[in-house]
Amino acid sequence: MLALKISVYTVVFFFVGIFLFGFLASDPTRTPNRKDLESPQD
């Protein structure tokens, strides 16, 4: 039972990590204007 929980948590965290990483990585690409908002001095 413990091994089952470990494998389930591993798979869940694996997919969640990929989802968050892909979302954060594609977020600035979809909104290039955000760079101007983050650095208005430029």
Curated annotation (Swiss-Prot):
Keywords: Membrane, Photosynthesis, Photosystem II, Reaction center, Thylakoid, Transmembrane, Transmembrane helix. One of its GO terms (cellular component) is plasma membrane-derived thylakoid membrane. GO terms for biological process: photosynthesis. InterPro entries: PSII_PsbI, PSII_PsbI_sf. The keyword Transport does not apply. The chain crosses the membrane at residues 6-26. It comes from the Bacteria. The keyword Oxidoreductase does not apply. It is found in: Cellular thylakoid membrane. It is a single-pass membrane protein. One of the components of the core complex of photosystem II (PSII), required for its stability and/or assembly. PSII is a light-driven water:plastoquinone oxidoreductase that uses light energy to abstract electrons from H(2)O, generating O(2) and a proton gradient subsequently used for ATP formation. It consists of a core antenna complex that captures photons, and an electron transfer chain that converts photonic excitation into a charge separation. Belongs to the PsbI family. PSII is composed of 1 copy each of membrane proteins PsbA, PsbB, PsbC, PsbD, PsbE, PsbF, PsbH, PsbI, PsbJ, PsbK, PsbL, PsbM, PsbT, PsbX, PsbY, Psb30/Ycf12, peripheral proteins PsbO, CyanoQ (PsbQ), PsbU, PsbV and a large number of cofactors. It forms dimeric complexes. This is Photosystem II reaction center protein I.
